């Protein structure tokens, strides 16, 4: 069988960045998704990014990956700021009608294991798949040769900036590596391979003024956090069933439910100081450097501090919790981590009961007498003790501070 030419394979993987799609998606994000999920969205450090762009620098944005909202928050803001950026996205996201939307938003496909193509159009792809036609297959080995050529086209001929999520998790039992969102809440290590390839492409293109921009997207509460426990478990749901429910919950149920209950949370996006592309440092060391730079940008909310200060216990006296909070705050201040939400206008630490009350409002879904929605409790407290009813969710937010506090 004759192999398809390389240009055909690259066309199947490429983005279709266009203003019409980005403008439409931006409108939906700002008037429904962001409005439904978040009470406050703050961007820090974007002015310096604009200055770098005006100076002619090529920018590679390296964020941690906590939520599906990460790329939408970033691409929406970058697009509205005139920073033309394309996104490296996993092949599992390009399904059905979402394929042209993602490509129109500047997403190009990266193949993790194997991807089968039946047509360049998603409708014909589904029809050809149903009819049993022979597909074009791109496996991991083939993609390792195509990836540098994708980047050369994007960074060279097209002149875009790049947004990459290089974080990965390793299954403790099977050893399988998973790229994408952190299901555990941990601040995942970054793949050295991504930095090896990008740096080699920059060198081949003779782009010497490129900078890696660390980005931290910190959520007071991740919109789709309740899904992650099931995604980590070996359930009977097929991949496509998980995919459909994931997107239904993340982009429809979560915004509607949080708007109805008025349980919107805060999110902060911080752009850090640019790190010049260094062609001499080892990729593993550079990946750890970028991870550390991202870690320094996080913002600590009441939820992360309280859940981490419980030390994995289900019941804890308030006195002991207050002592743990003070000890953790001391460590966070030593690392110069942003803890501003924990302090009032006069610079005083918020009372413990006030912080617990905030967490209760965000993490306890009360019963609605008008519209029956799922009811559950994560945390409760009385005069003397704090009780955890959802240890998996508490552990997820506790893990968010482990990387910086364990340094």
Predicted regions, residues:
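Membrane-interfacial terminal anchoring regions of lipid-handling membrane enzymes
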Residues: 1-407
């Amino acid at each position: 069988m004759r192999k398809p030419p390389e240009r055909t394979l690259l066309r199947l993987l490429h983005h279709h960045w266009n203003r019409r799609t980005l403008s439409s998606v931006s409108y939906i994000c700002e008037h429904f998704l962001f409005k439904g999920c978040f009470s406050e969205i703050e961007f820090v450090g974007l002015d310096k990014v604009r200055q770098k762009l005006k100076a002619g620098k090529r920018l590679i944005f390296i964020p941690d990956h906590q939520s599906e909202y990460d790329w939408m928050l970033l691409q929406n803001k970058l697009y509205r700021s005139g920073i033309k950026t394309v996104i490296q996205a996993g092949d599992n996201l390009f399904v059905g009608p979402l394929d042209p939307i993602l490509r129109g938003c500047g997403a190009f496909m990266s193949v993790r294991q194997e991807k089968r193509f039946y047509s360049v159009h998603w409708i014909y792809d589904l029809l050809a798949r149903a009819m049993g036609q022979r597909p074009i297959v791109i496996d991991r080995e083939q993609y390792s040769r195509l990836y540098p050529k994708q980047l050369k086209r994007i960074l060279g001929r097209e002149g875009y900036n790049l947004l990459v999520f290089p974080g990965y998790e390793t299954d403790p039992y099977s050893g399988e590596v998973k790229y994408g969102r952190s299901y555990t809440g941990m601040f995942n290590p970054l793949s050295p391979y991504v930095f090896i390839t990008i740096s080699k492409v920059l060198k081949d293109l003779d782009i010497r003024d490129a900078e890696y921009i660390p980005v931290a997207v910190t959520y007071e509460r991740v919109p789709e956090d309740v899904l992650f426990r099931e995604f980590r478990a070996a359930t009977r749901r097929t991949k496509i069933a998980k995919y459909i429910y994931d997107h239904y919950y993340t982009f429809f149920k979560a915004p509607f439910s949080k708007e109805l209950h008025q349980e919107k949370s805060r999110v902060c996006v911080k752009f850090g100081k640019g790190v010049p592309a260094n062609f001499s440092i080892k990729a593993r060391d550079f990946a750890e450097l970028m991870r550390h730079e991202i870690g320094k940008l996080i913002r600590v909310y009441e939820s992360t501090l309280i859940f981490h200060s419980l030390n994995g216990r289900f019941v804890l006296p308030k006195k002991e919790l207050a002592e743990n909070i003070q000890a953790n705050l001391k460590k966070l201040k030593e690392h110069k981590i942003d803890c501003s939400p924990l302090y009032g206008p006069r610079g005083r630490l918020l009372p413990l009961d006030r912080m617990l009350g905030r967490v209760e409002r965000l993490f306890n879904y009360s019963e609605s007498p008008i519209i029956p929605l799922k009811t559950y409790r994560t945390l409760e407290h009385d005069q003397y003790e704090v009780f955890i009813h959802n240890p998996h969710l508490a552990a997820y937010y506790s893990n968010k501070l482990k990387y910086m506090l364990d340094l």
